């Protein structure tokens, strides 16, 4: 007999809690009626269902939704919070790492994504440090995206051995 999924009740609960928060009947925290809160609630529902029923893709999507919601909720409140591009890449890498680390799949890809997002976050500081050490950075500032495009294309086009995973 096939077991029924708890996904629909979890999603319904998340949407209902958001509707209650948006109605303003209770003031729990500032910004409770904004759309990032809905993303976090839906993400939490997917995380719970994915963990409870061992559905890794739902767990990954849940972490990603929760992280994106958290980013857009926290960004206006804290000045030090990273920009969209860096943080979204970080959230993708973090979600992939957490959801697949038990199976030891995609760990290299997840860590690479996290490192790339950290590189982007600290890019200005790295360039300032190189310039203070009197290392020319004009070419690096202009052409670094093309280096990563080249690396990506090279990784896509080379034949992979089956022993990678």
Curated annotation (Swiss-Prot):
Signal peptide: none annotated. Its main location: membrane. It comes from the Bacteria. Keywords: Cell membrane, Membrane, Transmembrane, Transmembrane helix. It is a multi-pass membrane protein. GO terms for cellular component: plasma membrane. It is found in: Cell membrane. The chain crosses the membrane at residues 6-26, 28-48, 54-74, 78-98, 110-130, 138-158. This is Uncharacterized membrane protein YsxD.
């Amino acid at each position: 007999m096939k077991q029924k999924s708890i996904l629909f009740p979890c999603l319904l609960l998340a949407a209902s809690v958001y509707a209650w928060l948006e109605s303003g009947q209770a003031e729990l925290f500032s910004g409770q009626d904004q759309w990032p809160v809905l993303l976090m609630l839906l993400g939490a529902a997917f995380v719970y269902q994915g963990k409870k029923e061992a559905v890794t893709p739902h767990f990954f999507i849940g972490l990603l939704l929760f992280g994106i919601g958290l980013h857009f909720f926290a960004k206006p409140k804290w000045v030090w919070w990273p920009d969209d591009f860096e943080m979204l890449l970080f959230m993708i890498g973090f979600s992939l790492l957490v959801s697949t680390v038990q199976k030891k799949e995609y760990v290299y890809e997840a860590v690479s994504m996290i490192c790339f997002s950290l590189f982007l976050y600290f890019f200005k500081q790295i360039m300032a440090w190189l310039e203070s050490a009197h290392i020319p950075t004009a070419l690096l500032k202009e052409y670094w995206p093309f280096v990563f495009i080249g690396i990506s294309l090279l990784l896509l086009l080379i034949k992979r051995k089956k022993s990678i995973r």
